[in-house]
A protein has these predicted regions:
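ATP-binding/phosphotransfer module of carbohydrate and carboxylate kinases, centering on a glycine-rich
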Residues: 1-61, 82-85, 105-111, 154-293
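Phosphate-binding/catalytic loop of phosphoryl-transfer enzymes
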Residues: 71-168
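ABC-type ATPase nucleotide-binding domain
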Residues: 68
Length: 293
């Protein structure tokens, strides 16, 4: 008998298997989980691979799926169909990636802010009430994210090219990253159907590098991003009455030491106590499976 937690991401899917006494047995990794990116057929194939790796699904007592976009009704239908087909008869649940991230980050009430390609914040108070802010996608939201920083770098570059702003160093760095020399090449890259939000987010590194070198436009971009993440956290705290709580920093942009993380920590210290997560999101998914009633 066993339980399982699944952390489904845009680039890979991870599963943690534990025995029914909550002891870790193993972890495995598979391909991307996002049905919008890979399509329904590939999503079903992924699930079958994951379930096959578990062994006899009839022996699985509980399973928790955590992923962005998992509230999509069609995703729920497919999960149920594939679980049934695999012989699963236990209990299961699905929740957002922010929920498993928070559960992995801390055992106490608090807030987790995630800044990777996108951004989102999620919190839980003593009463068990939860709230989120952000996470509405790169077209209308994702402030403080890698996408937002990358977009602002490219924007500052073309403004500098026109003489509408400083940021000449950013322009040079954008040219170098694209192996380009004209504004037309920048525009062609940005609006190409092959350029997704992850490609734009790669330009966030320019902001970090240039800010570390003292470039003022880059520093301003990072400060705006830190303020956006601060606003995400404040919104959740206000709704949950969670003043001066632990705040876990998660996601590729702020989970390890860099100039942007320092700016974010400075802003978040006005609201609570920034902390490193105790465990990762996959641990959180498996723990939520174990705690399922």
């Amino acid at each position: 008998m066993f339980i399982a937690g699944i952390d489904g991401g845009g680039t890979h899917t991870r599963i943690e298997i534990r025995d029914i006494e909550n002891n870790l047995l193993r972890r495995e990794e598979f391909g991307p989980f996002n049905i919008n990116s890979i399509g329904e057929d590939a999503f079903r194939k992924l699930l079958r691979e994951v379930f096959a790796s578990c062994g006899e699904m009839a022996d699985c007592k509980k399973i928790c799926f955590g992923a962005a976009g998992i509230s999509n009704p069609r995703v729920g239908e497919i999960l149920e169909e594939e679980l049934n087909a695999a012989g699963f008869v236990g209990k299961w649940k699905r929740c957002g990636d922010q929920e498993i991230a928070l559960r992995g980050a801390m055992d106490t009430p608090g807030v987790a802010v995630i800044a990777g390609t996108g951004s989102i914040c999620f919190g839980k108070n003593e009463a068990g009430e939860t709230a989120r802010s952000g996470g509405y996608g790169h077209l209308i939201d994702d402030g403080g994210s890698g996408y937002a920083l990358g977009r602002d770098v490219i924007s500052a570059a073309v403004r500098a090219l026109d003489g509408r702003g400083q940021g000449k160093a950013l322009l040079d760095a954008v040219y170098a990253q694209l192996n380009a020399s004209t504004s037309a090449q920048i525009v062609s890259f940005v609006y190409s159907p092959n350029t997704d939000k992850s490609a734009i987010a790669e330009f966030a590194r320019i902001a970090l590098d240039q800010a570390a070198a003292g470039e003022e436009t880059a520093r301003a971009i990072l400060n705006r991003g830190a303020e956006e993440l601060q606003a995400l956290v404040a919104a959740v705290q206000n709704r949950l009455d969670l003043a001066d709580c632990p705040i876990a920093l998660l996601g590729g942009l702020i989970s390890s030491e860099n100039i942007y993380r320092r700016a974010v920590v400075e802003k978040l210290s006005e609201l609570g106590t920034p902390i490193a997560p105790a465990h990762d999101a996959l641990w959180g998914a498996a723990q939520m499976a174990y705690e399922m009633e």
